[in-house]
């Protein structure tokens, strides 16, 4: 099975270490452009743009990067409850047309009650999923060309329609992740690709089986994807050293403060991430080559695959064997790691999209002694 592999645009900041200004870098448009172009150059099929008050707006960033990329797809957030489904559908169709079919959409219900309240959303966890289901129902029908009348518990629209359709037909794909029962029900009923964070394979297997069964009961099939960090080096020993360096500036107070802040979330997925490490630095390899150190201070995806190229590729194939065809990866710092993943990991994977063809003015690598073209090294 060919794999769709995406990268990540760090619109909320980037650096060489977690939880420290040491090795940190300013993230501006020029830097995001570099990361996007590096991802496209290396053969990533798309990029995930994060959402939330700590991030730049994902839609505006994606739109700004369309002219400086050729094939890269942009996975941007749909936010039920903070925007009407009609306006969101219109924006989605426009982004898809402007990018000539390179827009993908990630349904994000939100898991931080404090941040949601700041955005004017005061619904319980259960109510948010009710509203999200109504939103998604309307959004999908509009993009598929229907005129929609809908009277729900949370949303009502009358004679809603789009005058300008999307490029992708019947509509652009819809991604979604969530670990609660309500989230799985929504995924089974309405989304195209269900995302999970990087839990150990056995836990992921159970979760996918539940969603697959729920979808089958609806007469549907759902694709699957996973969100992971990756630390790949020429040797597995070097990769583990890099993992330790990434958290080398974290002290106990920083970890405790981060875990206290994340504990207020009502996201089941976030609770599952926290349970993998328990807020401690001493037992972070939770499954072979799966490391939970990033989750000590980062919300959302908190695990990384660690190893040399063949080892990480083997772990990815274990997830692929569960039915996962889409891998959304990232690494710190995101510019350098995009190249590293492309050079060390991609030769060991069957990719759905290949690196962008280059019209090079010279050979790859520096000429040896002003005479010899560098020899190609075996990937075995």
Curated annotation (Swiss-Prot):
It catalyses: an alkanesulfonate + FMNH2 + O2 = an aldehyde + FMN + sulfite + H2O + 2 H(+). FMNH(2) which is absolutely required for this enzymatic reaction, is provided by SsuE. InterPro entries: Alkanesulphonate_mOase_FMN-dep, Luciferase-like_dom, Luciferase-like_sf, SsuD_RutA_monooxygenase. GO terms for biological process: alkanesulfonate catabolic process. Coiled coil: none annotated. Its EC number is 1.14.14.5. It comes from Pectobacterium atrosepticum (strain SCRI 1043 / ATCC BAA-672) (Erwinia carotovora subsp. atroseptica). It is an enzyme of class 1 (oxidoreductase). This is Alkanesulfonate monooxygenase. It holds the Pfam family Bac_luciferase. GO terms for molecular function: alkanesulfonate monooxygenase activity. The keyword Transferase does not apply. Keywords: Flavoprotein, FMN, Monooxygenase, Oxidoreductase. Homotetramer. Belongs to the SsuD family. Transmembrane segments: none annotated. SUPFAM superfamilies: Bacterial luciferase-like. Catalyzes the desulfonation of aliphatic sulfonates.
């Amino acid at each position: 099975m060919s794999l769709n592999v995406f990268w990540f645009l760090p619109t909320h900041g980037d650096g060489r270490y977690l939880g420290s200004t040491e090795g940190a870098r300013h993230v501006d448009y020029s830097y995001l452009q570099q990361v996007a172009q590096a991802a496209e150059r290396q053969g990533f099929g798309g990029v995930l743009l994060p959402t939330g008050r700590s991030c730049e707006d994902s839609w505006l960033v994606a739109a700004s990067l369309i002219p400086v990329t050729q094939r890269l797809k942009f996975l941007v957030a749909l936010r039920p409850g903070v925007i009407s489904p009609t306006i969101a559908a219109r924006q989605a169709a426009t982004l898809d047309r402007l990018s000539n079919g390179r827009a993908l959409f990630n349904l994000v219900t939100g898991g931080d009650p404090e941040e949601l309240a700041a955005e004017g959303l005061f619904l319980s966890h259960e109510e948010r999923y009710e509203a999200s289901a109504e939103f998604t129902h309307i959004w999908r029908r509009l993009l598929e060309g229907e005129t929609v009348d809908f009277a729900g518990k949370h949303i009502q629209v009358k004679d809603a329609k789009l005058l300008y359709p999307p490029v992708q037909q019947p509509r652009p794909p819809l991604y979604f992740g969530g670990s609660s029962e309500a989230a799985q029900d929504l995924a089974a009923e309405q989304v195209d690709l269900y995302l999970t964070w990087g839990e150990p394979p056995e836990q992921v297997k159970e979760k996918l089986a539940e969603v697959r069964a729920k979808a089958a009961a609806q007469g549907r099939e759902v694709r699957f994807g996973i969100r992971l960090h990756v630390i790949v080096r020429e040797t597995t020993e070097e990769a583990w050293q890099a993992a330790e360096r990434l958290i080398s500036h974290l002290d106990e107070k920083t970890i405790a403060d981060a875990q206290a802040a994340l504990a207020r979330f009502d996201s089941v997925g976030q609770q599952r991430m926290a349970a993998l490490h328990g807020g401690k630095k001493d037992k972070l390899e939770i499954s072979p080559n799966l490391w939970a150190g990033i989750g000590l201070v980062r919300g959302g995806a908190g695990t990384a695959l660690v190893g040399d190229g063949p080892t990480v590729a083997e772990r990815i194939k274990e997830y692929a064997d569960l039915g996962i065809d889409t891998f959304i990866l990232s690494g710190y710092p995101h510019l350098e790691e995009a190249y590293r993943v492309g050079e060390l990991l991609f030769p060991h994977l069957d990719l759905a999209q290949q690196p962008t063809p280059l019209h090079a003015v010279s050979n790859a690598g520096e000429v040896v002694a002003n005479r010899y073209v560098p020899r190609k090294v075996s990937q075995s």
